[in-house]
Each structure stands twice: as structure tokens, then as C-alpha cells.
């Protein structure tokens, strides 16, 4: 098949392209590089802001100068309802252009959108980065983020894309929960995040030493979305009760290759407080045998049909700090528990997230 992937979210489309290409499909990836990630792409949609508003013309030129690749595809998958770095009105026009000139359009449910915020405000899922304990939370920190997606032109764009796509694909259980409504259920599919799994020799069982090495990735401007510093405070509290047994390293802004080496060396990674399920960052750690503190709700394991593996130290914002600390402490200091979770982490990523298996599901 001839396939066009538009937009990028944490290398999802790049990794999927590799899997689809290996299966014999002809795949083109068109994106702006996902901001600072600067991920690879075949058609570059990045705006050169030296040109101000005129930089949008460059984006349109790059699209229309590649019409043989942009048109006539069997499948076009959009990473979100806005998929080119232009305002909502232009995204709306581009959606209808792609729908008219290609056979099938898939909307990816991979990121923020107006419906996601509407569902979160109604308590779906039970907790998120904007809602827990039956009420909205973090609203001041999230005000601009929500505003960006709820302006009238963006709501109209979302409506056109969501209601007129041939299918919707959610990459996370919480996104699937939000879209599993009578309006979308018949067209909705869950397909997990694709990953290039490191060779078996790159993974090692963690938690074997006397000292537990904990890695905390810091994103100060985004911590209201992730909650990593709150989890780190839980770990610090546990560390004070066990002097000399826990070593915590904070890291910010290191190159990707160095960060991967740090994941290899760590026993435990602090990830996200507000998520139900593992993120791409979590999966990169788990594939290396590093145990993750983050989202691993039983509802998620039941949803994917996993009866045995429970590799994640599950923390959540809607319980007390003391309960979260107890969960971490038990995982760290119950004999053999970290090693078991490390083994299960490797098995879990290979079972559900190998990019070749994910490409087959697509």
C-alpha cells in the first residue's frame, strides 16, 4: 500500500514507518519534526519563524510541491486533529484536501484535543493531569494549554476531522477511554505505541545491588503535566527512612544518547503521576529492564488482556502521599520484587510494543 503519515508524536510515526516499510509498504512521513525533537521526515513542514507569518507560505509550498506523495495514498494517518503547523482554519482546509485526494483517512488520538479536555472535565478517566478526586485540578497551570485547543476555529477543525475520518486510533488506554462513546465507538481502535526494542544483550535485570539507583528526568516547564517532582518527593521520603539504600539522580536537558545510557544504568525511573499507562519514556526504560514509577492501573492491564505481568510501580494523584510512598517502599524493599518487576518490564515491552507487531496490527 501507499501510506502517508502526517505529524509526529514522540517518534511514533517514525517507528511505525520503519515497521510498515519492512512489511513492504511505501510510506512517506510529513511533519515539522515534533518541535525540539527534530525527528526525521520525508517532507519538512517546519516553519522558519524568521519570516514571521510568511513562514506559513513555506509550509504550504512544501506540501503542494510534493503532491505525488501527498495525494493518491491508500491510507493517510494524521497524528492529531491539527497536523500541520498552521492555524485551525488551515488545518481544516488541509483535512478536506487530503480526504478528497486519498482513499482513507485515520485520525490519531495521540495528543491533546478539545474532546479530550471535555471528557477529562467530566471525570473520564477517573484521574488525569486536569482532574482527580472528583473535581478539576491544576486549572491555572493548564489555562493556556486548554485555551489553545478550545478556540472556535480549533473546535470546528476537531469536529470536521473527528466526525469525517474513516477510523480513529488511540495509542494510550486513557485516550481510548475518552473516545469510547456512542459517537465514535464503531470507528475507534486501540493500537499500542511502537518501539524499537533493544537487543537482549542491552537489557539487564535491575535491583540486584544494595543501593537502588533512581533516575528523575526534570522538565520544569512541563511538570504540571507530568508530576515527576511529586513522585520524586515520595522517593526522597522513602530514602530518608532507609539511609544509604537509595541514590537519586536528577537530570535535565541531556542529549538523547546520554539519556539512554543513564536509563541503562538506573534501577528505577521516575516518570508520570497523572497517567494510567506507560508513556514512550517509560517504555524506553522498561525495555532496558529499568523499573518505572508511573502509570500502571489494573484497568489498563485488564483492557489489554494481560493476566500476569505487572511491571510498573503504580502511583496516582487521587490517593494520599503516604499511600504512594508505601507502594514505592514495598516495591523497593520486598525481597526480590524489583528483580521480578525488571524481568516483567522487559517481557512486557517485547510482548506488546515491538514495532513489528504494532505495524502488523495497523
Give, region by region, the residue ranges found by the protein language model:
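Short hydrophobic beta-strand element within catalytic cores of glycosyltransferases
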Residues: 291-300
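A short, active-site helix/loop in glycosyltransferases that binds the activated sugar's phosphate group
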Residues: 117, 145-188, 233
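Membrane-proximal helix-turn-helix segments that form the acceptor-binding/catalytic region
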Residues: 64-71, 93-100, 104, 130-168
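Conserved catalytic-core segment of nucleotide-activated headgroup transferases in glycan assembly
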Residues: 176-254
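Acceptor-binding helix/loop patch of EC 2.4 sugar-transfer enzymes
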Residues: 39, 46, 107-152, 221, ...
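A charged, aromatic-enriched C-terminal amphipathic alpha-helix characteristic of glycosyltransferases
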Residues: 333-362
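Acidic donor-binding loop of glycosyltransferase active sites
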Residues: 264-277, 290
Amino acid at each position: 500500500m501507499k501510506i502517508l503519515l502526517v505529524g509526529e508524536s514522540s517518534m511514533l510515526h517514525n517507528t511505525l514507518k520503519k515497521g510498515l516499510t519492512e512489511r513492504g509498504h511505501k510510506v512517506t512521513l510529513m511533519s515539522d519534526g515534533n518541535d525540539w525533537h527534530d525527528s526525521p521526515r520525508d517532507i519538512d513542514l517546519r516553519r522558519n519563524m524568521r519570516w514571521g507569518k510568511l513562514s506559513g507560505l513555506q509550509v504550504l509550498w512544501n506540501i503542494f510541491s510534493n503532491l505525488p506523495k501527498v495525494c493518491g495514498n491508500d491510507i493517510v494517518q494524521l497524528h492529531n486533529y491539527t497536523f500541520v503547523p498552521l492555524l485551525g482554519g488551515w488545518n481544516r482546509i488541509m483535512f478536506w484536501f487530503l480526504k478528497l485526494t486519498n482513499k482513507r483517512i485515520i485520525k490519531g488520538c495521540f495528543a491533546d484535543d478539545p474532546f479530550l479536555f471535555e471528557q477529562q472535565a467530566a471525570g473520564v478517566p477517573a484521574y488525569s493531569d486536569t482532574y482527580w478526586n472528583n473535581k478539576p485540578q491544576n486549572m491555572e497551570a493548564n489555562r493556556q494549554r486548554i485555551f489553545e485547543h478550545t478556540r472556535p476555529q480549533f473546535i470546528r477543525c476537531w469536529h470536521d476531522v473527528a466526525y469525517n475520518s474513516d477510523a480513529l486510533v488511540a495509542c494510550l488506554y486513557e485516550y481510548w477511554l475518552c473516545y469510547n462513546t456512542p459517537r465514535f465507538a464503531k470507528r475507534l481502535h486501540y493500537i499500542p505505541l511502537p518501539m524499537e526494542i533493544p537487543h537482549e544483550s542491552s537489557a539487564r535485570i535491575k535491583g540486584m545491588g544494595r543501593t537502588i539507583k533512581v533516575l528523575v528526568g526534570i522538565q520544569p516547564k512541563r511538570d504540571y503535566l507530568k508530576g515527576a517532582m511529586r513522585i520524586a518527593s515520595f522517593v526522597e521520603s522513602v530514602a530518608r527512612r532507609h539511609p544509604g539504600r537509595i541514590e537519586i539522580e536528577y537530570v535535565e536537558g541531556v542529549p538523547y544518547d546520554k539519556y539512554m545510557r543513564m536509563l541503562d544504568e538506573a534501577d528505577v525511573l521516575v516518570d508520570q503521576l497523572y497517567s494510567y499507562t506507560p508513556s514512550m519514556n517509560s517504555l524506553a526504560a522498561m525495555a532496558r529492564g529499568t523499573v518505572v514509577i508511573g502509570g500502571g492501573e489494573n484497568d489498563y492491564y485488564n483492557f489489554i488482556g494481560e493476566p500476569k505481568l505487572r511491571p510498573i510501580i503504580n502511583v496516582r494523584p487521587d490517593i494520599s502521599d503516604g499511600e504512594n510512598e508505601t507502594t514505592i517502599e514495598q516495591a523497593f524493599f520486598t525481597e526480590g520484587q524489583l528483580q521480578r518487576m525488571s524481568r516483567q518490564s522487559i517481557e512486557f515491552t517485547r510482548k506488546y510494543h515491538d514495532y513489528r507487531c504494532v505495524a502488523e496490527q495497523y
